[in-house]
A protein has these predicted regions:
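Cyclic nucleotide-binding regulatory domains
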Residues: 26, 51-111
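Long cytosolic regulatory regions associated with cyclic-nucleotide signaling
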Residues: 1-17, 139, 143, 162, ...
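Polybasic "coupling" helices that flank or enter modular domains
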Residues: 131-202
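Phosphate-/nucleic-acid-contacting segments
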Residues: 172-262
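Cyclic-nucleotide recognition modules
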Residues: 86-145, 149
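Residues that recognize and position ribonucleotide moieties
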Residues: 45, 64, 86, 107, ...
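Cyclic nucleotide-binding regulatory module and flanking cytosolic helices
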Residues: 1-49, 92-94, 99
Length: 262
């Protein structure tokens, strides 16, 4: 099991044009003055793989968004083994508000770059601005969806079903990001190393590789490189997943560009 390693916080304020733009895109429904206030509360933080943001039974001290990397929602089984119950990836929100202790460990499964806020300051902001309460509802629903998605994903009996379901989860989340149109080709990077992804999906690296190439041969995805893919046949990918994951919350089934499309 990875041990916690010191994070390397950056100075107060976003300090990054891309993070600033992301924050404003994610919170575009809020009035300008409120976005400015949140922008002043935000900070960037880099954490190493294995760093725990919170342990089961502890209270979150920060909330925020993942700019890159992946965080795993983990439970420790009675025999000491770790069980992943959910995965948070780029642009997902983490942390709990107006709630008690966490029901799971939240651990970096890869080096992660975070845009975060002090929890107490963020709660105070939400309490003072009713318009921001929609953020709470979205956060609660996202966490419920994440747990449901992972449960459905791991119910797949075949490796290719679990891999297809995981790629669909990444695809659906990518469509929700600011500026992402539903009718354009979406290029998505795997959030963790293949060897780690195989472990989280309950298989071996070679089986994961075979499943990815099977999905490419079936016309569901195009492998840009070993860690990046494009969905080119959404119906084929949904069929391969063999479960009802899908595109609720993404505005229906989008048109996806074929191999020669733009």
């Amino acid at each position: 099991m990875a041990m916690d390693r010191p994070a390397s916080p950056r100075p107060s304020g976003t300090g990054s044009a891309s993070a600033h733009a992301l924050l404003r895109g994610l919170l575009k429904t809020l009035p300008e003055a409120q976005r400015d206030e949140l922008d002043g509360l935000a900070r960037l933080r880099d954490i190493a793989e294995g760093t725990a943001l919170v342990r089961e039974g502890e209270r979150y001290r920060t909330v925020g968004y993942i700019l890159s990397g992946a965080l795993g929602m983990q439970k420790t089984l009675p025999d000491g083994r770790l069980h992943v119950i959910g995965l948070l990836v780029q642009h997902d929100m983490f942390g709990r508000l107006f709630d008690g202790p966490s029901g799971f460990d939240l651990v970096a499964l890869a080096p992660a770059h975070l845009l975060e806020f002090d929890r107490d300051a963020f709660e105070s902001f939400v309490a003072r601005h009713p318009e921001a309460q929609q953020l709470l509802l979205t956060r609660i629903l996202d966490e419920i969806d994440t747990a449901r998605e992972w449960l459905l994903l791991m119910s797949g009996h075949k490796v290719v079903e679990r891999v297809a379901a995981f790629l669909l989860i990444l695809f659906r989340r990518a469509l929700r990001q600011p500026g992402q149109a539903g009718d354009r080709r979406v290029r998505i990077a795997l959030p963790v190393r293949r060897v780690d992804l195989a472990h989280y999906l309950g298989t071996r690296p070679e089986s994961l590789s075979r499943a990815l190439h099977d999905l490419q041969r079936a016309g569901a995805i195009h492998l840009v490189d070993p860690n990046t893919f494009e969905v080119i046949g959404l119906r084929a990918l949904v069929d391969a997943a063999g479960s009802d994951l899908l595109l609720s919350g993404a505005g229906g089934e989008p048109r996806v560009a074929g191999p020669g499309g733009g």
